[in-house]
Amino acid sequence: MSLQAPKGTKDLLPTESYKWQYLENKFRNIAADFGCREIRTPVFEYTELFQRGVGETTDVVQKEMYTFEDKAGRSITLKPEGTSPAVRAFVEGRLFNETQPTKMYYFTPVMRYENVQKGRLRQHHQFGIEIFGAKDASVDAEVISIPVGIYKELGVEGVELNINSIGCPKCRKTYNEALKKYLSKNYDKLCSTCKTRFDKNPLRILDCKVDTCKEIVKDAPIILDYICDECRDHFEALKSYLDVLDIKYKVDPFIVRGLDYYSKTVFEFIIDDITICAGGRYDYLIEEIGGPSMPAVGFGMGIERLLLTLQEKAIEIPEEAYVDLYLGNMGDKAKLEVLKLAKELRDRHIKCEIDHMGKSVKAQMKYANKIGAKYSMVLGEEELNTGKVALKRMEDGQQIEVDIKEIDTLIKVFK
């Protein structure tokens, strides 16, 4: 039996990679517009990072992480999300000593042991932005505006933005007490995981995916009724900034996100009942990981889910021709000249393909057409003797005569 990719993973083949490159280039340009610079972190980290950052009682840590011991007996985890590693790098690199805010973006694979379903893989990829050092709600609004701009530029319609505030540790303590009082009436109906969460972290019960628990929390107390004045002012300011930016939103008091590090602002972008981007503020994570007390906010966007959305909305990503010129040849002498000419053109960043298969001229032209070459030319004995060759535009068949030796003139055709 032939070997296959592990369940929940997917190869990115050359026929699809242009879509990723298109999105990545667009994301990079938009991130640069906001003053963000790229960060790259390891694909695995010490398990403690996610236990402390994401939270011991979360589904991510309890059920979804790929964790193993290395040969030295250290507990290692393939990263299940991008924020904690970015914060760890920020702290370890002592970037908090630099002028703030620090703005960074990343593309990263993330691994979670989840049920494989439409738009959900065990290895997927995220585009994320993290901004450290700014506590004003205006930066929350700016971060939210980035996915808004991405969807608008891609032509994706029907995306809903839901926002909430989950307060700070001070006001969340009061809310947790009210939540536990409410949940205690239905304690016996909670799933085994949520019974454990009841004392350790009742807020996580709001994020449970079990149907009985989802039904129980429908009438639970609303956290917005319990947040302190500072958190309320921050949330009201955020709404004002979103209004100024003409960003439509809906307040959803039951958004808590599945990661413990969030505080104050949380948000989700939803289309057809599927979350395609999410994030929020995490003002205590930097200190939790060993850095100074410093505010932060960010988001993660699933690239596979975005591509699926584009496909479902029949939004096509333009495929650029990856070959500028197909250089055909007739005979061994011509093949040598084609090799030399291709090298000269490639040195000038003209994308060339030549025949290595000994195909007939007819087969070479058929291949040139199949790979989407913009132009083609065929060198044979006559072309070598005269120094002239017909350059054919594949789109419409129009031909012009060019001098093989006049490289600069030839280059101008492609620029």
Curated annotation (Swiss-Prot):
This protein's name: Histidine--tRNA ligase
Quaternary structure and partners: Homodimer.
Localization per Swiss-Prot or TrEMBL: Cytoplasm
GO biological process: histidyl-tRNA aminoacylation
Keyword Ligase: yes
SUPFAM superfamilies: Class II aaRS ABD-related, Class II aaRS and biotin synthetases
Similarity comment: Belongs to the class-II aminoacyl-tRNA synthetase family.
